[in-house]
A protein has these predicted regions:
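RecA-like P-loop NTPase motor core of helicase/translocase proteins
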Residues: 1-177
Length: 177
C-alpha cells in the first residue's frame, strides 16, 4: 500500500493536486471526454503495469455488447503497435463467452499477459450466468466455477464507461471480481 500511495502522490503532485495522506482503497478513476483516446490510455496502462510491476491479468468491463465489440476491435487494430512498443511481451486477448469455459481456464493459468473483455451483464446476472456454475472444463485445483478462477488471479479491473454501467461495478459485480 505504501508504494501505491507514493505513486499516487507523485501523480497528484505532478498535476498540482494535494497529495492523499492515506490510501482509502485500491480503486482509481480516470475520467476523459468521449473521443479523447480513453481506450488507448487504459490499454497502454495495462502494458505499463505489466512491464513495471509484472501484473498480467486484466479484465475490461463494459456496459454493452456494442462497446465490448468496439474494445475488441481496438485490441485488434493496436496489436502491432503494442507489440512494437513492448517487444517480447506476449499477450492474449479475447471476449468472455460463457460457451467457451476453456478461455477462462486459460486466463487463470496462462503465464502470459491476459486481457479479457466482458459486459457487466456477464457478471451481474448471477442466476442465469455460467460464470457462477461449476464446470469440469474450468476446474483448477479446488476451484471449479469460472468466477472463482478469475477471482483467484486478483485481476486488474478496468471499467469502461462506468457511468453507463448500472451504478459502476457496485454490489454483486464488484464483490464477484
Amino acid at each position: 500500500d505504501d508504494v501505491l500511495r507514493k505513486n499516487l502522490n507523485n501523480v497528484q503532485l505532478k498535476n498540482q493536486l494535494p497529495p492523499s495522506p492515506v490510501l482509502d482503497s485500491h480503486d482509481f478513476t480516470v475520467e476523459m471526454e468521449t473521443g479523447t483516446g480513453k481506450t488507448y490510455v487504459y490499454l497502454r496502462t495495462m502494458f505499463e503495469l505489466n512491464k513495471r510491476y509484472g501484473m498480467s491479468k486484466f479484465i475490461i468491463v463494459v456496459p454493452s455488447v456494442a462497446i465490448k465489440e468496439g474494445v475488441y476491435k481496438t485490441l485488434q487494430i493496436t496489436e502491432e503497435h503494442f507489440k512494437s512498443l513492448y517487444a517480447g511481451v506476449p499477450y492474449e486477448y479475447y471476449l468472455y463467452d460463457s460457451a467457451k469455459p476453456a478461455d477462462v481456464r486459460n486466463f487463470a493459468t496462462s503465464s502470459v499477459m491476459q486481457i479479457m473483455v466482458m459486459t457487466v451483464g456477464a457478471i451481474n446476472k448471477k442466476d442465469v450466468n455460467k460464470l457462477y456454475q461449476s464446470s469440469e472444463k474450468t476446474t483448477v485445483d479446488d476451484l471449479d466455477k469460472p468466477i472463482d478462477l478469475i477471482r483467484a488471479t486478483r485481476p486488474i479491473i478496468i471499467v469502461d464507461e462506468p457511468q453507463s454501467v448500472d451504478g459502476g461495478l457496485n454490489g454483486a459485480g464488484k464483490t464477484a471480481l
